[in-house]
């Protein structure tokens, strides 16, 4: 073997054609006939509204890292891709595009509009697939799904009909959140409440046949046309005499009654409220209670309808101004006040949302809320990472209201309900009525989240229902990776819809992540213009650098702060790995062959040391990856590669490669440890790990390798002390400007019992290390004229009067003494904290006790040394 990497790491060259290579080798394809254990992830489908953003890059990198890790650890994996039609969002985009071309959606008609929407979908689906490739996602494209695929559409209809027949879905006229710009109902979670500078308007409602009036405050005068009564509290002595009397509505002169209800807060405002059941949720419930009529005074576009008389056709906010102007003229206006209140805006159009009485389809939530809460309180609960989000889910489900699932859109799953043209009979079914010419289908479509809620299993059925082999093998899916912002939007709905239809949970684990924030810790948004295009980062620094940054900064449930500096640090890490790999390849002979049994020979101590460190790293990384703790796994691996392998073992190997006795085993060790490093790094940095691996001429791909662990446990702990000694002596040379060709004599003093034994046992080896790596002779007798370097509880005494600076040494030791005193205080507080003792794992408590004792030992050694120095 004689392979050489390019002298310089070039991410563009490394990442070029790799993805196609993986696809050509079918390395991402699930093997349904494999006897390996199954592991599956269904990709949360991105919306076909546009390109992927940095949040998608993070979300998908997490999933891909899990899939690659599981593949390397012996699983048959399925990573199923798909996209979401995203009803309202996509329709808004397509409408805007048509508008730019001078085309009106309504004139175009439904069928032709849908053709335009499908063109949009195809265009952006292709863009998204290219972005998936740039991100290196190991997706099985043979299983790709779209939420409007015919087989998915069939499942959606089947479940709608089942839920309807089971009386879970119903149609009713209720108050909904209405987007007057998009002319559709939207769900509660699609309403964004913002603190807004508003006004409160006070009007006179004059009593019938009297000059008296009651003052009523409202923020929405345009809804007064639909007022049905005034309401006062029966216990409010100010207004008891007016109950059952009548007043004249100041905007339309209609006579309406005054009724009483304890719902009215005596202390709020004037204590009199107007009741408009069709335009306010609380008023709606009062209307039902008191059997009030519910006329609607606004059109679906937010303009005033025929109830507004002379105001008919005016936009609601234009009408508001005119109503106030005319009320002033008629002396029916009292005053206006500036207020700050919470106003609901549509998440998609940013229009102010209207509470609006409308015929809609709903899902009953009573059964489902109990279903989810009971599940999460059982032994079969879905595991949330971190666990606190299971409680968040339970709280949201406790407060859940019936879910409005109909949308007044064209793009989406049209509701499978037909109305008879003559009798208005309603028919709900998977297939249309046989005499279709006599029926008209419901024009509404389903809320996008209804079909998305079926995603975990509908993607696996392939027109074969629950008998599908994919469903049998890969369901429930292994883990869902998603953001905390859509736990109720999506996660909860997937759980209860899946449970209701399949009687199984949709996934075993849920890994929750946060948001990607900018470098100033602000949420990324179009309005701030602070978004990051992941494709730009990939072009400039490589996909591996982006993924390494995202994954090594990923803590379950937490936000991540984007950092150009950390992206560059990731690139530098990969560059160091590249250069280390070049060093390995340059030192291998033409006829080098890897011997998988090389470690069974009598290995030199540094080869033993790196294999022991490797084994510890493999164990740690494996454990943390299985718990989705990517930051801990990645940073531990980073430290091992950078510090132990590149910085120290490669340096040790240079000596061994010049010793015929150790040359062969050192080459084998260099090669083997590099291979294992690449396998561990592959889930994080797939492109460069594959490139280096292919140069090792082993298998067709690193994805065909197996995550292993030699369980090496050689007695090499003294090497860690050697490294500390070498580092301290080198730092001492640099600080004192002592050239490397000046040989230093040193002695080790103040060792505790363990170190005394250890250093005695390995004296000759330590001598050789210090001599070879920092031109230092280790002597076994005390040195009188010396400079002392503190390492843990012991000292390195350097014999050379010209280097002594007693005052500086005392100062350094006093600083370390202060540091240790602080650490001892901190450790004491922790160990005296009963909550910590009660909740912490035993190994965590033991670790803190060991630290505490080490601090005490080090402090005593420094005190003794300071005493010795001050007595000289």
Swiss-Prot record:
ValRS has two distinct active sites: one for aminoacylation and one for editing. The misactivated threonine is translocated from the active site to the editing site. GO terms for molecular function: aminoacyl-tRNA deacylase activity; ATP binding; valine-tRNA ligase activity. PANTHER family: VALINE--TRNA LIGASE, CHLOROPLASTIC_MITOCHONDRIAL 2 (PTHR11946:SF93), VALYL-TRNA SYNTHETASES (PTHR11946). A motif ('HIGH' region) lies at residues 46-56. The keyword Nucleotide-binding applies. It is found in: Cytoplasm. It comes from Mycoplasma mycoides subsp. mycoides SC (strain CCUG 32753 / NCTC 10114 / PG1). It catalyses: tRNA(Val) + L-valine + ATP = L-valyl-tRNA(Val) + AMP + diphosphate. The keyword Membrane does not apply. A motif ('KMSKS' region) lies at residues 523-527. InterPro entries: aa-tRNA-synth_I_CS, aa-tRNA-synth_Ia, Anticodon_Ia_Val, M/V/L/I-tRNA-synth_anticd-bd, Rossmann-like_a/b/a_fold, tRNA-bd_arm, tRNAsynth_Ia_anticodon-bd, Val-tRNA_synth_C_sf. GO terms for biological process: valyl-tRNA aminoacylation. Catalyzes the attachment of valine to tRNA(Val). As ValRS can inadvertently accommodate and process structurally similar amino acids such as threonine, to avoid such errors, it has a 'posttransfer' editing activity that hydrolyzes mischarged Thr-tRNA(Val) in a tRNA-dependent manner. Signal peptide: none annotated. Monomer. Belongs to the class-I aminoacyl-tRNA synthetase family. ValS type 1 subfamily. Keywords: Aminoacyl-tRNA synthetase, ATP-binding, Coiled coil, Cytoplasm, Ligase, Nucleotide-binding, Protein biosynthesis. It comes from the Bacteria. GO terms for cellular component: cytosol. NCBIfam families: PRK05729.1, valS. Its EC number is 6.1.1.9. ATP binds at residue 526. This is Valine--tRNA ligase. Residues 796-872 form a coiled coil. PROSITE patterns: AA_TRNA_LIGASE_I (PS00178).
